[in-house]
């Protein structure tokens, strides 16, 4: 799932959603097998989540700066809209991941010990 989220964040707003870099899709197919996601690139779950959070923050900051550029008139409307749509997609992904983590935590706390 994490590799799919990374592939989504790597998509450009100007390319079709089905177009993914072949390098990323090849590595994601190997990483989707159970038990190999962390072993494929030697990254821990915490570091992957940290990288995703920092990517999300940079995407949101980029959209904010692009909106200011649009207000100043230095960016086209299309650039501003593309940047805002990418930021919205990033935010929706972060919210979905947060909801899944909270749900998993609640399930663990309901377990009897």
Curated annotation (Swiss-Prot):
Pfam families noted in UniProt: FliE (PF02049)
Keyword set, alphabetical order: Bacterial flagellum
InterPro entries according to UniProt: FliE
Main subcellular location: other
Compartments where found: Bacterial flagellum basal body
CC terms in the record's Gene Ontology section: bacterial-type flagellum basal body
GO molecular function terms noted in the UniProt entry: cytoskeletal motor activity; structural molecule activity
GO biological process, one term: bacterial-type flagellum-dependent cell motility
Family according to the record: Belongs to the FliE family.
Protein name in UniProt: Flagellar hook-basal body complex protein FliE
């Amino acid at each position: 799932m994490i590799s799919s989220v990374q592939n989504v964040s790597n998509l450009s707003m100007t390319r079709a959603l089905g177009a993914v870099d072949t390098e990323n899709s090849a590595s994601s197919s190997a990483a989707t097998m159970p038990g190999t996601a962390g072993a494929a690139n030697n990254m821990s779950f915490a570091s992957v989540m940290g990288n995703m959070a920092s990517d999300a923050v940079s995407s949101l900051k980029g959209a904010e700066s692009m909106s200011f550029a649009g207000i100043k008139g230095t960016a086209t409307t299309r650039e501003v809209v593309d940047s805002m749509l990418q930021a919205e997609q990033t935010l929706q992904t972060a919210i979905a991941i947060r909801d899944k983590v909270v749900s998993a935590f609640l399930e663990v706390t309901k377990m009897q010990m």
